[in-house]
């Protein structure tokens, strides 16, 4: 599966700061020092509907991570998956009378278009769950043969009790885990499981649903968590720098994935930092496909909204915060974009040297994009009020905003 085209990232003078990021597993900020190649895995979409602003907010956060690392002169090995076979996708296809593969391909193509328009840097590897199945089967077999997985009526489950580190990612107690498991695709009430929290690794073939050759596992399809583990281990290995996604993935998805990988390799941790973006709401509820309370990126683009304004709207909220999408949020972003473009359109202006460092410092401090925007606002206000004589300043500001915030002025 191919990703989307990359926009050019301008080189800035000097060197960026090392990233200090909030780690869900420890509950505090840690400073990451990835070495010459930073490694990041971000969980991708389940392609049964268009990209909404909640999706965009998540991918914006991890785009900032890439840009901070690139500014430190590192290479970035970024991997993202597509969950192109899953119950919600199959259910939507049946509801709408569509072929599930055509639905997945169409929505994945639209996602690529949205990411291109928003100038999100693409992953080096963009991998669908279906194409990963040949690598998933032997991992499930290894877990079963090692006693970390068991058969239940033809389905294969992972035994969470075999991982001594289970629970470290989310920090939740057993009851909270059980409640969230039931809400987020688990089956804690299924009789016969060793632990109610045990997640499915391999689902035996069901009538009317797609299935694949699972060798000794039998015909079926993989569970959600093992898909990401297989892709991450194949392309990044253990101990990569950031496992990223929305905050609703901390449990069960990232918790279970870490346990799968740790049981497979005997190594810990799966990732050095677990980084989670907040939820975007609409009308008082989390924006989600299941609720149908969605604002689509593609719809806003068709209505003529500049993608750069959408990007600024996302950047106006800290990535870890939960926030509401409103017309006012968008209006403020449109107005900010106009101010910035007017400021950099002049032939000269106030010195921008301090601005570059302020934006760098803000983003290195747990991706504080609101502080970065405020720094650019101050320069634009000074330009509007007093102007300046530095002929290179508007260009420096434009390149800084492009390189570090992904906004083309």
UniProtKB/Swiss-Prot annotation:
Per the UniProt entry, what is one GO biological process? cysteinyl-tRNA aminoacylation
The answer to whether UniProt assigns keyword Zinc to this entry is yes
Cross-referenced CDD domains: Anticodon_Ia_Cys_like, CysRS_core
Q: Name one GO cellular component term.
A: cytosol
Q: Could you say which cofactors this protein requires?
A: Zn(2+)
What reaction(s) does this enzyme catalyze? 1D-myo-inositol 2-amino-2-deoxy-alpha-D-glucopyranoside + L-cysteine + ATP = 1D-myo-inositol 2-(L-cysteinylamino)-2-deoxy-alpha-D-glucopyranoside + AMP + diphosphate + H(+)
Residues that hold L-cysteinyl-5'-AMP according to the record: 43-46, 58, 81-83, 224, 246-248, 280
| Intrachain S-S bonds | none
> Residue ranges for motif 'HIGH' region?
45-55
Q: Motif 'ERGGDP' region at which residues?
A: 183-188
Q: So where does Zn(2+) get bound?
A: 43, 228, 253
List where the motif 'KMSKS' region lies: 286-290
Keyword Ligase recorded:
yes
Q: Which SUPFAM superfamilies does the UniProt record give? A: Nucleotidylyl transferase (SSF52374)
> Cofactor: bound how, per the entry note?
Binds 1 zinc ion per subunit.
Q: EC number(s) per UniProt?
A: 6.3.1.13
- On the tree of life, the source organism's domain of life is Bacteria
The GO molecular function terms of this record are:
ATP binding; cysteine-glucosaminylinositol ligase activity; cysteine-tRNA ligase activity; zinc ion binding
Q: What keyword terms does UniProt attach to this protein?
A: ATP-binding, Ligase, Metal-binding, Nucleotide-binding, Zinc
Can you state the subunit structure given in the record? Monomer.
Q: Which family does it belong to?
A: Belongs to the class-I aminoacyl-tRNA synthetase family. MshC subfamily.
Outline what the protein does: Catalyzes the ATP-dependent condensation of GlcN-Ins and L-cysteine to form L-Cys-GlcN-Ins.
Protein name according to UniProt = L-cysteine:1D-myo-inositol 2-amino-2-deoxy-alpha-D-glucopyranoside ligase
Which organism is this protein's natural source? Streptomyces griseus subsp. griseus (strain JCM 4626 / CBS 651.72 / NBRC 13350 / KCC S-0626 / ISP 5235)
